[in-house]
């Protein structure tokens, strides 16, 4: 049992709410922040507040952005005939690192997960359907290769095929049960190259 002042305990609790941060790590982060010079703490707090206040979702793809549309959607050099569907904005960063994909993206902000009570209406599928037009030739489904990701991929294929668009799935160079965020660049590159039609 720790005997920290209430303000320290509160900060530990807030850090512990972050994904992947347990009590011990939250405690270390809190103590580190308390040892920083006041101006650095203020900069850190201001950066959090500014990011939360200015960052929004792109109205086209759902990526994080500070201007709408985002830098990718407004880039005239991107191939708008290909849309890569991903689960979260962080997956865009993973795919952009390999510098082999020049299409656009669509962020679902989740996956279909009946066990978690998330159905198709709980993810950004309506936005994807709105984007399908005569200019879109292919939709690459790059959801994670786990049960929820596969279920989501199959559902997307089912709703898009009647619209006459080619639907492909990234190859499984990404390990089953893994996340795109943790895949290395070569694995992601091979997964994109080896995508298959659904």
From Swiss-Prot:
Note one Pfam family from the annotation: RecR_HhH
Which residues constitute the signal peptide according to the record? none
Show the PANTHER family listed in the entry.
RECOMBINATION PROTEIN RECR (PTHR30446:SF0)
Q: What name does UniProt use for this protein?
A: Recombination protein RecR
Q: Which InterPro entries match?
A: DNA_Rcmb_RecR, Rcmb_RecR, Rcmb_RecR_Znf, TOPRIM_dom, TOPRIM_RecR
Q: Mind telling me which SUPFAM superfamilies this protein's record contains?
A: Recombination protein RecR
The source's domain of life comes to Bacteria
Instruction: Tell me the ranges covered by the Toprim domain, including all copies.
Output: 81-175
What are the recorded Gene Ontology BP terms? Answer: DNA recombination; DNA repair
| UniProt GO MF annotations | DNA binding; zinc ion binding
- NCBIfam families in alphabetical order: recR
GN (gene name): recR
Family membership: Belongs to the RecR family.
Zinc finger (C4-type) positions are 58-73
Per the UniProt record, the source organism is Clostridium novyi (strain NT)
Record key words, sorted: DNA damage, DNA recombination, DNA repair, Metal-binding, Zinc, Zinc-finger
What does it do? May play a role in DNA repair. It seems to be involved in an RecBC-independent recombinational process of DNA repair. It may act with RecF and RecO.
| Matches recorded under CDD domains | TOPRIM_recR
